[in-house]
Amino acid sequence: MEYKRFKTRQIKVGNVSIGGDAPISVQSMLFTKTRDIEGSLEQISRLYFAGANIVRLACLDMADARALKEIKAKSPLPLIVDIHFNHNLAVYCAEFIDGVRINPGNIGSKENIKEVVKACKERGIPIRIGVNHGSIEKQFSDKFGYGVDAMLESAMYNIKLLEDLDFFDIKISMKTSDAQKTIEAYERLRPLCDYPFHLGVTEAGTKFHSTVKSSIALGNLLLKGIGDTMRVSMTGELEEEIRVARAILQDSGVQKSGVNIISCPTCGRIQSDLLSAIKIVEEKTKHIKEPLNISVMGCVVNALGEAKGADVAIAFGKNQGLVIRHGEVVAKLKESELVDRFLAEVEDEVKSRAVKE
């Protein structure tokens, strides 16, 4: 299956390009109170090392806005301010922030939006029109309810409003908590404009539910060439948001990065402690950013076949096993020695690629 991405306009959030030919960026949002400067910076640091590209923060009042200015000065990542209800906070934050997200369902009048646009235009920063099925403007929800039709009307209305103000540094999100509706919303909007899309399923739930919903919705859209930046929303799971987002990009074939682990589900043929081995391998390889296929198999039935397509592989047997690299056996060892040797081969593979580059 050939992947062909929809060509969108390119904008910039800080030093991160979004749209056009830029890589699909991964975002997250802090769950600290923004006025907690140290706590917010600690979470930003965690996201930075997890591989996030952009971070969004809530701004409820001027205490948050003033704190955000200090956070921005110390942040290693571009920051977006998330604004609801009070457009004056967006105007204030536009002086130092990298991007503004507004919810057209609660930002208020056209005059409010004009003020936000003026502030963002002066700084040259983008605005995300963040349409959410749970907070559609009354004029559209009264006519269409809270479904995709209302979301489309809201998006197009607000796009035109910004364009009429000669503002084009726009990205758009069309979020619902339902995977199918999310897919429909983005698919129907895509032919109507060429602005970059921020993908996400809102209020997706805890790790398990979010992973399922986000994989279905975001994976589906990405395979259709839709999407320029994305967030996997999870209740209270910062690093996991990034990890799952990167996995969706990798397993959809859209953007290769990090380790792809192939492992068997286990059965009665297993004669080794495969479960413990997998846990160790996952933990010890999660820092790797290089695209790498590794295989950890519990018996000989599929192990050698999978190893041929892997960069590094283990084939467990009874009390012993093989370490395989690019289809060639490099070691036959006792079970207790296999994982350490395997991990050493993985690290050597990463280093050898770095030298070639």
From Swiss-Prot:
Binding-site positions, [4Fe-4S] cluster: 264, 267, 299, 306
GO MF annotation, one: iron ion binding
Keywords: 4Fe-4S, Iron, Iron-sulfur, Isoprene biosynthesis, Metal-binding, Oxidoreductase
UniProt-listed Enzyme Commission number(s): 1.17.7.3
Disulfide bonds: none
GO biological process: isopentenyl diphosphate biosynthetic process, methylerythritol 4-phosphate pathway; terpenoid biosynthetic process
Cofactor binding annotation: Binds 1 [4Fe-4S] cluster.
Top-level division of the source organism's lineage: Bacteria
Recorded catalytic activity of this chain's protein: (2E)-4-hydroxy-3-methylbut-2-enyl diphosphate + oxidized [flavodoxin] + H2O + 2 H(+) = 2-C-methyl-D-erythritol 2,4-cyclic diphosphate + reduced [flavodoxin]
Signal sequence segment: none
Swiss-Prot/TrEMBL cofactor(s): [4Fe-4S] cluster
Enzyme class: oxidoreductase
PANTHER family cross-referenced by the UniProt entry: 4-HYDROXY-3-METHYLBUT-2-EN-1-YL DIPHOSPHATE SYNTHASE, 4-HYDROXY-3-METHYLBUT-2-EN-1-YL DIPHOSPHATE SYNTHASE (FERREDOXIN), CHLOROPLASTIC
Function: Converts 2C-methyl-D-erythritol 2,4-cyclodiphosphate (ME-2,4cPP) into 1-hydroxy-2-methyl-2-(E)-butenyl 4-diphosphate.
Family, as annotated: Belongs to the IspG family.
Protein name as annotated: 4-hydroxy-3-methylbut-2-en-1-yl diphosphate synthase (flavodoxin)
Taxonomic source organism: Campylobacter jejuni subsp. jejuni serotype O:6 (strain 81116 / NCTC 11828)
